[in-house]
Amino acid sequence: MRFAIVVTGPAYGTQQASSAFQFAQALIVEGHELSSVFFYRGGVYNANQLTSPASDEFDLVRGWQQLNAQHGVALNICVAAALRRGIVDETEAGRLGLASSNLQPGFTLSGLGALAEASLTCDRVVQF
C-alpha cells in the first residue's frame, strides 16, 4: 500500500511527531511505500535546523532527515505555516531580507498542493 503522513505537532512537546516517525518506520519495515510526509501547523517545527535536543533524547529532526536520505521520502512543509513560525529556506530568507535560513536539508517548502497530490495518489493518508 502507498501511504502519506500529515504531521501537525512539533518535534518536541507533544507525541504527534514522534508517533508519526515511528509509524513511518513501521510502514517501511512492513514493505509499504511511504511517498511523503506533509508537515502542517506546528508540525513545521520538525524542519527547524536549529533544534537542539538534550544529549539523551532522540533527535527527531535529524531522524526525519535520515528517512528522506535513506528511503527517498519527500518531506514537505507548508510554506505559509513555516513562514509564520520563522522557518525559512535560503530563497525565502533572501526575499524577506533575513540574515540566514534555518530549514533542515531534506525538507522542502511546499504549498497545500503537495498535500492534495498525496491525497489523490496514495491509498491512505494518516494524520498525527
UniProtKB/Swiss-Prot annotation:
Cytoplasm in keyword set: yes
Gene3D superfamilies reported for this sequence: DsrEFH-like (3.40.1260.10)
Alphabetized InterPro entries for the sequence: DsrEFH-like, Sulphur_relay_DsrE/F-like, Sulphur_relay_TusD/DsrE
Active site: C78 (cysteine persulfide intermediate)
Superkingdom of origin: Bacteria
Subcellular location: Cytoplasm
Annotated keywords: Cytoplasm, Transferase, tRNA processing
Enzyme kind, highest EC tier: transferase
Subunit structure: Heterohexamer, formed by a dimer of trimers. The hexameric TusBCD complex contains 2 copies each of TusB, TusC and TusD. The TusBCD complex interacts with TusE.
Stated role: Part of a sulfur-relay system required for 2-thiolation of 5-methylaminomethyl-2-thiouridine (mnm(5)s(2)U) at tRNA wobble positions. Accepts sulfur from TusA and transfers it in turn to TusE.
Protein name: Sulfurtransferase TusD
Organism: Shigella boydii serotype 18 (strain CDC 3083-94 / BS512)
